Amino acid sequence: MGGDADPDALRALVHDLRTPLTIVEGFSDLLVRRGAELEPEQRDEFAQRIAEAARELRAIIDWADR
């Protein structure tokens, strides 16, 4: 996506990035602030959600960079 990128396509890309980024921010914040209070299963679930969102972000970025 160079300098002449379609503004609508750019808006769509930003929108697609926002959801997985929000997941990463939210669950990592929970782990930092309350990780010691959580059950191990909850910590594992949150870490899994973060990993899945990171993979989704990577896929979107790889798609946009082709």
Where would I find each of the regions flagged by the language model?
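Residue-level recognition of alpha-helical structural elements
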Residues: 6, 39-43
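Short alpha-helical segment of the dimerization/phosphotransfer core of two-component systems
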Residues: 52-57
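Conserved signal-transmission helix
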Residues: 1-7, 66
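Short alpha-helical N-box/ATP-lid segment at the N-terminus of the HATPase_c
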Residues: 58-66
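Short, charged, amphipathic alpha-helical segments
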Residues: 44-48
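Conserved C-terminal segment of the DHp
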Residues: 23, 27-40
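Conserved phosphoacceptor histidine of two-component systems
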Residues: 11-16
